[in-house]
Each structure stands twice: as structure tokens, then as C-alpha cells.
């Protein structure tokens, strides 16, 4: 009989630990070489900044490569769009690191905005335009108008303090699904893209693992050169290897898709880029506004806001900072809205969001310095103006970028799981909220994406394309679905007793709910130039 015996009611005898203790809970990671406020020496900081620039180039190039041909543009338009997105990303990264969250977060393009942007591209009012260049400009101006209106949502929600009040209800438990799927949820941009040219992508991921995980254990030294600069080493080697395959005629008789993925001379960016060009506002003409498209883009802006909140949290972990107070996250969201506004004004063709891959790079290098990311922003602006030189680096084959994503997205996902250390995993309430939100965060978007792939339109299919996007796009985001579900369940299923608060991990995060309740918050997140006196955080 189970649990029978002796009148003890099945109570197990106390276990002998023999000196075994659980790992200590840490609100700051101690194994980071340079934290948010401690910059490396200048030569090392410049190389690390260039490495961040290389990593963010992937998304910066892939998004225009996908969108521009459908807009009617050619290599010249694609090069200009890449330059503009790069230029605005540099500005946004500087603004975020100086006045926003002050975290070492790179602000770049986002895949979240792509479906709604594609809906604008396919709008019927552009189908009668025969001149490809005129069609490109007209569509770009429509995208600009939608982005300008969408930016208002993040600006108002962030600077009004509304997002601060929402984030105060966020616990470590509800943050886990959001942060974890902000990384793991991007798996389709990893190996599936890498496999389009396996002979280039596979060597890249193998070399990246060797340089970052194995060689440092074989060759021990104080400088930690190999794991800190693993991206530069591996990308240069595979890039040369891919170029040798290209000039050697390895892809001469292959299909178009293989040549596009594998060859180093197929991007068209070098030939399409001018030597020197400074992007400027309204370069494509005055923006046009369409109410439905603006509402659809605002819905996407809200999804991006939630995804970015999760990424900010994991960036703070990898920068060895304390959890950002709600007022700091709200401030960051407001400046991110300014970033979306700049994307609309300059005509970047995409919105601004926190770069998940660069967040993963912080974990790989174990350098969370704010100065490094500011240097990378300098590289973005510099190479966006010197078009030809920037295009050389931007011609890295997409499978090489995908190999980097495999590692960096995994780091971000693992950073989300690490928040479980604050929670009680023996609680069935914790198990339910965690398991259900993660499962549904994978299952619901899978249904929406699979339905769209088969039918060429989403489950919500009305005559109003903008309304379809307002429903279909949010439910196609894994981090959004998981984060919203976990947040809702955690808040509505909570009781006021201290045991439940402890299970949720709030005992650990309570001290960071107010800016002044922990002295480290002022060290990491106070505004520069004594601006805290005029814009105090609460």
C-alpha cells in the first residue's frame, strides 16, 4: 500500500544533504567581465563595438532584402533602405543608451513589423502604378505614415508612466515565458535559414562553438581573446571560405535560390550603394496616411513594446545590472517610440525594437559595457554614410547570419529561464502558469502561421486587411502570446498572502519596484548630465 507503514501517514524521513546546497540566487550575474558601468580598454572596446555592428547587420540587411523587391525597388533602392535603417539604428541606440533605459541594448530593425509592412505593400491602391521606382516611393511613403502614427502609442504609454504601472505587476514568474520565447521563439530565423546553404552555415556554427566554448578551455589566458571575439574570427574565416567557393565556380550550375543564399556577390549592395550619402528625413517624399494601416501598425507597435520589455530584462542580466525598475522600463519604451518615429521620418521601411541577437552577444562575450554599444552605434552611423564600405560588410551570406542567430537566440532564451531561480518550482501554481503559457505561446502562433502558409491569409480574414493584421499579427508572436498569458494568469490567480508572493518571486523583485529603494539602481540607470534633477525616476 503506497505510503503505508507505521502510522506515519507516508511522511518521508528527513534527507541528509551531506553538505549539498542549492546554487545561490543572484540578482546580478557575477561572471561578467565588464558590467554596464565599467568599460573595457579603448582598443578592446572598439573591436567589441565593431562586433556588435557586424551582428546587427544581419537583420538590417535581411529585412530590406525581403521587402524591397516586392515594393518594386532594385539594388539601388535596397542599398538606400539598408543605409537608412542602419543610420536610424545608430541614432536610436545612442538615444536609448544615453536617455532611455541606459542599458547596453542595440536598437535595430524588427521582424515583428514585417507582416504589416507587407500588407501595406500589397494594398490595392499601389497595383496600378507601372513605374517600379515610383511604386517603391509611394509604398515607402505609406509605410512612413503608418510608422509615424504607430510611434505615438509607445511615446504616450512610455512617457506618461502608464507602462510603469503595468510593469509593477510583472513578477519573475510571468517574465520567464516572455523573455524565454523572445529568444527561443525566433527559431525559424536560425537553422531553417542556415540550411539554405549548409556548406557555409554549418562551418560557421561549428567554428563559433569552437572559438567561444572549447578553445578557451584548452588555451587559458587572462585576455580571453577567443571567446570574446569569436564572432569576428569565425565570420572572417567562413566569409573567405565562401568567397573562394564563389570565385571557384562552385555555384555556377546551381539554382537561383542556392546562388542567392551561398554566393558572396549576389546581394547587389556594393554595386547599388553610393560612395557617400547621408540619409535625411522625407527622402522619399512626404508621408501618406491611411487610417486602417495606421491602426494595424499601432497593434504591431504594441506587440513590439511587449517583446522589447522582455529583451530589456535579459539585457540587464547579461550586463550584470540589477532588474530595471518599472520607471526605467517605461522611460525606455518612450524613447523606443521616438525611435519608431525616426524610422517613419527617415523612411527606414521598418520599426525600431531591441535587437535580440545583440542581447545574446552580451552573454557570449560577457561584456555588458554601455560604452561598447555606444561605439557600435558610431560604426552604424559611420558605415551608413560611407555606403560602399558599409556594403562590403553587409554582403555576408544569410546562412552565416543564421548561424550566429542559433547561438544568440539560445542565450536570450536561457536568460529567460534563469529567472526561475527567483520562483518556487515546487508550487503547482508555478508549474501551471509556466507550462500553460509556454505551451500556448508556441501552439497558438503555430496555428496562425501554419494557416497563413497554407491559405495565404490568416485565420481572421475579412475585407479589411488592416483589421486582419490587428488580430493575426499579435497572435503570431510567440513572446507576445506567452507573455500576455503568463501575466494575466499570474495577476488573476494571485492572493495577497506572503507565500504566494514568495512563489512568484516578488520577494526578490520588490526592492527594485521603486527607483530609490536600491542604491544600485541609481548607479546603473540614472540619466547623464545631471538630468535626474529635472526628470526624476520614481
Curated annotation (Swiss-Prot):
PANTHER family: XANTHINE-URACIL / VITAMIN C PERMEASE FAMILY MEMBER (PTHR11119). Residues 1-20 are annotated as: Disordered. One of its GO terms (cellular component) is plasmodesma. The keyword Transport applies. It is found in: Cell membrane. This is Nucleobase-ascorbate transporter 7. Expressed exclusively in ovules. It is a multi-pass membrane protein. InterPro entries: NCS2. Residues 1-11 have a biased composition (Gly residues). The chain crosses the membrane at residues 45-65, 81-101, 103-123, 143-163, 166-186, 191-211, 229-249, 295-315, 372-394, 398-420, 432-452, 471-491. It holds the Pfam family Xan_ur_permease.
Amino acid at each position: 500500500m503506497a505510503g503505508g507503514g507505521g502510522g506515519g501517514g507516508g511522511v518521508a524521513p528527513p534527507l541528509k544533504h551531506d553538505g549539498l546546497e542549492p546554487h545561490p540566487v543572484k540578482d546580478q550575474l557575477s561572471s561578467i567581465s565588464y558590467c554596464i558601468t565599467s568599460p573595457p580598454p579603448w582598443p578592446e572596446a572598439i573591436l567589441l563595438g565593431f562586433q556588435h555592428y557586424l551582428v546587427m547587420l544581419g537583420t538590417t540587411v535581411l529585412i530590406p532584402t525581403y521587402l524591397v523587391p516586392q515594393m518594386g525597388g532594385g539594388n539601388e533602392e535596397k542599398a538606400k533602405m539598408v543605409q537608412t535603417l542602419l543610420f536610424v539604428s545608430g541614432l536610436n541606440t545612442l538615444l536609448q543608451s544615453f536617455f532611455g533605459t541606459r542599458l547596453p541594448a542595440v536598437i535595430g530593425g524588427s521582424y515583428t513589423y514585417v507582416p504589416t509592412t507587407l500588407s501595406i505593400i500589397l494594398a490595392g491602391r499601389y497595383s496600378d502604378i507601372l513605374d517600379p521606382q515610383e511604386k517603391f516611393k509611394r509604398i515607402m511613403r505609406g509605410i512612413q505614415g503608418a510608422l509615424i502614427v504607430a510611434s505615438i502609442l509607445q511615446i504616450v504609454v512610455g512617457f506618461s508612466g502608464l507602462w510603469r504601472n503595468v510593469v509593477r505587476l510583472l513578477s519573475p514568474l510571468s517574465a520567464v515565458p516572455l523573455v524565454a520565447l523572445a529568444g527561443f521563439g525566433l527559431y525559424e530565423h536560425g537553422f531553417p535559414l542556415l540550411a539554405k546553404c549548409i556548406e557555409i552555415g554549418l562551418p560557421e556554427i561549428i567554428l563559433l562553438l569552437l572559438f567561444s566554448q572549447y578553445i578557451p578551455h584548452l588555451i587559458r589566458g587572462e585576455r580571453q581573446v577567443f571567446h570574446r571575439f569569436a564572432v569576428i574570427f569565425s565570420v572572417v574565416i567562413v566569409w573567405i571560405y565562401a568567397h573562394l567557393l564563389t570565385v571557384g565556380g562552385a555555384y555556377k550550375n546551381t539554382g537561383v535560390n542556392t546562388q542567392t543564399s551561398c554566393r558572396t556577390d549576389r546581394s547587389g549592395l556594393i554595386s547599388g550603394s553610393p560612395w557617400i550619402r547621408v540619409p535625411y528625413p522625407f527622402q522619399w517624399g512626404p508621408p501618406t496616411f491611411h487610417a486602417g494601416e495606421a491602426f494595424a501598425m499601432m497593434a504591431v507597435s504594441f506587440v513590439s513594446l511587449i517583446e522589447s520589455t522582455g529583451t530589456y530584462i535579459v539585457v540587464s542580466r547579461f550586463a550584470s545590472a540589477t532588474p530595471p525598475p518599472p520607471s526605467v522600463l517605461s522611460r525606455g519604451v518612450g524613447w523606443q517610440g521616438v525611435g519608431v518615429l525616426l524610422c517613419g521620418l527617415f523612411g527606414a521601411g521598418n520599426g525600431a525594437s531591441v535587437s535580440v541577437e545583440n542581447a545574446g552577444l552580451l552573454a557570449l562575450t560577457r561584456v555588458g559595457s554601455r560604452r561598447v554599444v555606444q561605439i557600435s552605434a558610431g560604426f552604424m552611423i559611420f558605415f551608413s554614410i560611407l555606403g560602399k564600405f558599409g556594403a562590403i560588410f553587409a554582403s555576408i551570406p544569410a546562412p552565416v547570419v543564421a548561424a550566429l542567430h542559433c547561438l544568440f537566440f539560445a542565450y536570450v532564451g536561457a536568460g529567460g529561464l534563469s529567472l526561475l531561480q527567483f520562483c518556487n518550482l515546487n508550487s503547482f501554481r508555478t508549474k501551471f502558469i509556466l507550462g500553460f503559457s509556454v505551451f500556448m505561446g508556441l501552439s497558438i502562433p503555430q496555428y496562425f502561421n501554419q494557416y497563413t502558409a497554407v491559405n495565404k491569409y490568416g485565420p481572421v480574414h475579412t475585407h479589411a486587411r488592416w483589421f486582419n493584421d490587428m488580430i493575426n499579427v499579435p497572435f503570431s508572436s510567440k513572446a507576445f502570446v506567452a507573455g500576455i498569458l503568463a501575466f494575466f494568469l499570474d495577476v488573476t490567480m494571485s492572493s495577497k498572502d506572503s507565500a504566494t508572493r514568495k512563489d512568484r518571486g516578488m520577494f526578490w523583485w520588490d526592492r527594485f519596484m521603486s527607483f530609490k529603494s536600491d542604491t544600485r539602481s541609481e548607479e546603473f540607470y540614472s540619466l547623464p548630465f545631471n538630468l535626474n534633477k529635472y526628470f526624476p525616476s520614481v
